[in-house]
């Protein structure tokens, strides 16, 4: 942690499209007084630092620079976006073996620097890589957080906002489970202005089939974006900024993140997307949603899918 009072330091590892979008979002919001960018492509990190520096006159003063893993020593937060990108036709789980190797080369030097803050992981497959970060680092589980279903939940709220012509910020709805193909919309707990989404839907002639189609569109939106422009980055960059803000400002905000399961939903020893309280010490509390029987089965099936891929990936890494 930074030794200066009220001086917060963030280190970003990975300056690709997602990382640079996150850095821009942090600069725009004026969050953290010191922001370090680490990547194997040094010219890019130096260029981004110089470019972001130019925004300070319009936002807030901030020390922004290209750095090394040693700069993590006194950081409050290390955000990992580094990894091989998802290609058209490739699932997030297809990325596991490539990105486990990359992650193992990142976490060790961060920890060796003396870092004692919070890890926030966004590289895909994020649930598996968050678990691996926890394992590789030896950190307490509450100080290793994944972006989880934060982006997916935003997509759901935007889609429901469009469907019912309301501000998506007035929609309280969560995508849960894997950040990927086995995720699901927890419609049983979703509300619009305190009213259950299913009640609002019924009044407006929106059927369960329509809601299922909307959910499927949310699940596949990443693939639509990837097919059109090659990658997703603005949405996830903003989601990471929101989680970072909750941590650095000790907000105790309820956000959908990748959290370690210790009996919740009947699950153990896995990171998966769920609402949780996020603040200055990391993940403070998991909000165990009262899911329907069908949704609980989807949550457990999603976890089983993740656990199999996780175990296979870690076993392969150990055998190398």
From Swiss-Prot:
The active site is at residue 179. InterPro entries: L-lactate/malate_DH (IPR001557), L-lactate_DH (IPR011304), L-lactate_DH_AS (IPR018177), Lactate/malate_DH_C (IPR022383), Lactate/malate_DH_N (IPR001236), Lactate_DH/Glyco_Ohase_4_C (IPR015955), NAD(P)-bd_dom_sf (IPR036291). The modification Phosphotyrosine is found at residue 223. Substrate binds at residues 86, 92, 124-127, 152-155, 232. It is found in: Cytoplasm. NCBIfam families: L-LDH-NAD, PRK00066.1. This is L-lactate dehydrogenase 1. It comes from Lactiplantibacillus plantarum (strain ATCC BAA-793 / NCIMB 8826 / WCFS1) (Lactobacillus plantarum).
